[in-house]
Amino acid sequence: MKTGIHPEYVDTTVQCGCGHSFTTRSTKQSGTIVVEVCSQCHPFYTGKQKILDSGGRVARFEKRYGKRNKAAADK
């Protein structure tokens, strides 16, 4: 393996927009990474997630034309 070609691996502080910060290791030389969301404020991890059921093409079809019953489909 060649020496001197790999970037230096340094301790890095990750700062979130919510104020939470944690330390990890990275090759980023500044030593600081700023992110918008983290596991402390992301809705998926906090349990405040809104589930949007936009339906789909099948739901739209069933809404327009009604759901077919199985007996009619077998004929």
From Swiss-Prot:
S-S bonds: none
Residues bound to Zn(2+): C16, C18, C38, C41
InterPro entries to which the protein is assigned, alphabetical: Ribosomal_bL28/bL31-like_sf, Ribosomal_bL31, Ribosomal_bL31_A, Ribosomal_bL31_sf
GO CC terms, sorted: ribonucleoprotein complex; ribosome
GO BP term, pick one: translation
Cofactor: Zn(2+)
Keyword line: Metal-binding, Ribonucleoprotein, Ribosomal protein, RNA-binding, rRNA-binding, Zinc
GO molecular function, one term: structural constituent of ribosome
Record text on cofactor binding: Binds 1 zinc ion per subunit.
Database matches in Pfam families: Ribosomal_L31
UniProt family annotation: Belongs to the bacterial ribosomal protein bL31 family. Type A subfamily.
Subunit structure: Part of the 50S ribosomal subunit.
Function, in words: Binds the 23S rRNA.
UniProt protein name: Large ribosomal subunit protein bL31
Organism in which the protein naturally occurs: Mycolicibacterium smegmatis (strain ATCC 700084 / mc(2)155) (Mycobacterium smegmatis)
Gene name tied to this protein: rpmE
